[in-house]
Amino acid sequence: MESNVHIPILLNEVLSAFNLKETDVVIDLTLGRAGHSQEMLKKIPKGLLIGIDKDKSAITFSKEKLEQIGSNFKLFHSDFSKISDLLKELKISKVNAILIDLGISSPQIDNANRGFSYNKESRLDMRMNLDQKLDAHFIVNSYSEEQLKNLLYRNAEIKNSRQIAKIITSNRPIETTLQLSVILKKYLPAFIVRKKDPSKAVFQALRVEVNDEINSLNFLLKNLVSILEENGKVAIITFNSIEDRIVKKYFGSFIKDDVLAFLPTKKEKEFEVKTYLPSKKELEENPRSKSAKMRVLKKIER
């Protein structure tokens, strides 16, 4: 059974960074269970909240939650990379705040049937969007050893990716999450297993591949700033070093000073970036926030 309890990560930091006005237009590109969106909607009684999620169950659940607060929201079952098309459909050109939480929601992890957790028995799945065909079962049982090696390194920077790819291909068919987890622990050297459960990184790599997460993020970032109003902000919460490097590089490209230091006139600053980490209190109350980092890009008013 799926738990609907989800504690939004860095909620206070999101609200503080956005400092929303009552007429603002806000986009939550990773709606989830509307943990962030519920609180943002309360801040914009005369504005508009736009929520997007790949997971239909997230849309259904969030709609009921948000309706208890107001009616000034629109929800879409879609990939966040489609935001430009959705805004055109809504005839909106600029927004005041954009939130992207790249973490998987607690209900998805806790629902054994979704196949995201290496601690719960389930058919290998890991699809955010249950309408798509590609799932973890197909990847684990059909990809070549070379393909598996590449995705394990590309999506989770697993150093012994070739060794793990060989273990997987040598033990097919692999049907379930726990079966894969047991195989990894059985055939990898004991010192590796003792140091860190190898399933964590392998499951991350598979999930990223199934949902095309890196490509979707890169595509999204291309046009994100163009839809920001002046003083608008983009907040992106990441949970691993690969995502964070992508976001850091993207945000950094807007604050890099291309004007030589010795010139008498410097280019006026157009953007600023701030970084936030979970507080000690949040870490104690929600251990899943441990690896979270939020970067916020602000478009400065000219």
Swiss-Prot record:
One GO MF term attached to the UniProt entry: rRNA (cytosine-N4-)-methyltransferase activity
Gene Ontology CC annotations of this record: cytoplasm
Coiled-coil region(s): none
Pfam families the UniProt entry points to: Methyltransf_5
Primary localization class, coarse: cytoplasm
Domain of life: Bacteria
Catalytic activity: cytidine(1402) in 16S rRNA + S-adenosyl-L-methionine = N(4)-methylcytidine(1402) in 16S rRNA + S-adenosyl-L-homocysteine + H(+)
Biased composition (Basic residues): 290-302
Disulfide bond sites: none
InterPro entries: RsmH, SAM-dep_MeTrfase_MraW_recog, SAM-dependent_MTases_sf
Disordered, as annotated region: 283-302
Annotated EC: 2.1.1.199
Function per UniProt: Specifically methylates the N4 position of cytidine in position 1402 (C1402) of 16S rRNA.
Family classification: Belongs to the methyltransferase superfamily. RsmH family.
Protein name: Ribosomal RNA small subunit methyltransferase H
Naturally occurring in which organism (per UniProt): Mycoplasma mobile (strain ATCC 43663 / 163K / NCTC 11711) (Mesomycoplasma mobile)
